[in-house]
């Protein structure tokens, strides 16, 4: 996945939003469902096709509707992209929402949206294990592949980080606990005052 911010335009309407450069299997790995159209194909990625799947809120903001948009053209970073799908609403929070995202082939992202000094660079990889017992093995295999592709010797430390959903949940729980203690402290001070 390669992510960035860019302006998406349809006619006179535009929105600054997250652009996600992804592979053709992203929708399967993340369980991203579509209400209309289809996700792009391996051929679209290979050919650096200018195709896009819009989040429903982004589609609504740009066009005033979430349907009948397949085949229309939006501009991302002033390049035309043909709409091939509309994602199903997932909801979000006040800070971010996948419903405002646009998904394009990672190769189109590298070529047209985020020209990079390091070719084929990515921000992060999403890897899905076959089952919960395979997670550690999948992470070890991914680590081996990344170390080899980064040409790291056995004495060199990793130049990347790896996390799994357990790690993310643990961090979220720690933050929640800290906030709970902080709010309890504020409440106690308020009662004293």
Residue ranges and their predicted role:
Residues 1-5, 121:
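Membrane-proximal extracellular/periplasmic loop immediately following the first transmembrane helix
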Residues 4-5, 58-59, 167-168:
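Alpha-helix capping/helix-boundary segments
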Residues 6-10, 91-95, 170-172:
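A short acidic, helix-capping loop that chelates divalent metal ions and anchors anionic groups
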Residues 13, 20, 24-40, 48-153:
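Mid-to-C-terminal secondary-structure elements
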Residues 126, 134-135, 142, 153-185, ...:
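Peri-transmembrane interface segments
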Residues 192:
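Glycine-rich active-site/cofactor-binding loop and its immediate structural neighborhood
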């Amino acid at each position: 996945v390669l992510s960035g911010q860019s302006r998406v335009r349809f006619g006179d309407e535009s929105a600054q939003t997250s652009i996600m450069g992804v592979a053709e299997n992203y929708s399967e790995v993340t369980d991203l469902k579509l209400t209309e159209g289809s996700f792009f194909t391996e051929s679209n990625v290979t050919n650096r096709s200018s195709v896009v799947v819009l989040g429903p809120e982004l589609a609504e903001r740009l066009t005033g509707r979430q349907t009948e948009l397949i085949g229309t053209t939006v501009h991302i970073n002033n390049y035309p992209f043909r709409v091939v799908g509309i994602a199903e609403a997932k909801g979000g929070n006040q800070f971010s929402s996948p419903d405002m995202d646009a998904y394009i082939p990672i190769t189109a992202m590298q070529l047209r949206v985020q020209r990079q000094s390091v070719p084929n660079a990515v921000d992060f990889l999403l890897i899905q294990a076959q089952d919960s017992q395979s997670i550690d093995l999948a992470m070890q295999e991914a680590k081996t592949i990344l170390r080899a592709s980064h040409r790291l010797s056995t004495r060199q430390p990793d130049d990347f980080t790896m996390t799994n959903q357990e790690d993310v949940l643990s961090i979220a729980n720690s933050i929640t606990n800290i906030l709970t203690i902080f709010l309890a402290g504020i409440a106690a001070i308020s009662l004293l005052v």
